[in-house]
Amino acid sequence: MSLKNWKDNGWIREHRTSRQETTNLFAIVERDLSDAASTQLSADWRFGIAYNAALKLCTILLFAQGYRPEKSLAHFRTIQSLPLILGESKKADADYLDICRIKRNTVEYDMAGAATPADAEELIGFTRELLADVRAWLASHRPELL
């Protein structure tokens, strides 16, 4: 399936991004990665903050492709767009982030203590790697957004 198919299905809509919007989103990512590294916060909060940073990176990619998610399943669609943009080799990364999405929802809405410090550290490390991948992709495909 392609992003055009997603648009035709009504899952995403057209969006024109800008360098300023991308800069603002990267600033959120950097802030969230810094905050998530604080061991003064619970593992649940650190995990949720790191998840937000990863989600913003997926958002940057989707925006750079000229789309934004519709309201229904917005996080899910944004995450699942990762392999459509960066390539099929990122399918496992999208699957991992979807598992993180579910866990983040659990610790945000249902119960405390479901995320461990190791979970938070793993997601922080993953997000740092994804940040490098997103910057490299933008430099190659949409340098005007950097």
Report the location of each language-model feature.
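Terminal alpha-helical segments
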Residues: 1-146
